[in-house]
UniProtKB/Swiss-Prot annotation:
This is Small ribosomal subunit protein uS3. Belongs to the universal ribosomal protein uS3 family. Gene3D superfamilies: 3.30.300.20, Ribosomal protein S3, C-terminal domain. The keyword Transferase does not apply. GO terms for molecular function: mRNA binding; rRNA binding; structural constituent of ribosome. Keywords: Ribonucleoprotein, Ribosomal protein, RNA-binding, rRNA-binding. Part of the 30S ribosomal subunit. Forms a tight complex with proteins S10 and S14. NCBIfam families: rpsC_bact (TIGR01009). CDD domains: KH-II_30S_S3. PROSITE patterns: KH_TYPE_2, RIBOSOMAL_S3. It comes from Campylobacter hominis (strain ATCC BAA-381 / DSM 21671 / CCUG 45161 / LMG 19568 / NCTC 13146 / CH001A).
Length: 231
């Protein structure tokens, strides 16, 4: 089960919080869901190169607040805050209601699964070899303190005639352990040979009563594993 489902959705309410936080009356639920989708789709497309990790949406009776967690907040804010004001006006025009936008910096972009997936996808679009792109992201995640990382790429890798899936695994990624804090990200690389899907799982530690704790290090370090599946 843990291998198939989205690890973030599986852990909601356990060690992950919702990214849309509001409690409306029943009749307003479809409209709010539609607005949340429009906001995320618009911001992801417009601010793709800002390295967006999360878009948090909070609603009260009369207010709508959007918090953007990005690796490069300066790209969003612009000189003297000019870009953020233009962005707010565009979102207001999209929804026809007042919106407050906050920007937060992602202090550890190397440990973000979504940013890692987008990094691999951008390298594939620049014709970088997929194995080289995957290994580079794995090294960045390990330097950022990740306990384990798994990257999977699927499609016509290297321009091959037949699509296949390849994945790398470093460390541990316990998908069945609900107390494990696992980040997940997905991105698509649009290449001349077709789309290549990129999935990334990053294991950050186990969430206990006192928060995330590092694992015991008295065991011998495990060797890296790589496997290929599929034709």
């Amino acid at each position: 089960m843990g291998q198939k489902v989205n690890p973030i959705g599986l852990r909601l309410g356990i060690n992950r919080n919702w990214e849309s936080r509001w409690f409306p009356v029943k009749s307003a639920i479809p409209e709010n869901i539609s607005e949340d989708y429009k906001i995320r789709k618009f911001l992801k497309a417009k601010l793709y190169y800002a390295g967006i990790n999360q878009i948090l949406i909070e609603r009260t009776a009369k207010k709508l607040r959007v918090t953007i967690v990005a690796a490069r907040p300066g790209v969003i804010i612009g000189k003297k805050g000019s870009e953020i004001e233009n962005l707010k006006n565009e979102v207001v025009a999209l929804l026809k209601k007042d919106v407050t936008i906050n920007i937060k910096e992602e202090r550890r972009p190397g440990s973000s699964a979504q940013l890692a997936a987008e990094n691999v996808a951008m390298q594939l679009e620049k014709r970088v070899a997929f194995r080289r792109a995957m290994k580079k992201v794995i090294q960045s995640a390990q330097k950022a303190g990740a306990k384990g990382i798994k990257i999977s790429v699927a499609g016509r890798l290297g321009g091959a005639e037949m699509a296949r899936t390849e994945w790398y695994l470093e460390g541990r990624v316990p998908l069945h352990t609900l107390r494990a804090k696992i980040d997940y990200g997905f991105a698509e690389a649009h290449t001349t040979y077709g789309n290549i899907g990129v999935k990334v799982w990053i294991f950050k530690g186990e969430v206990l009563q006192k928060g995330i704790q590092a694992e015991k290090t008295d065991e011998a370090p495990k060797k890296s594993r790589r496997s290929r599946r599929g034709r």
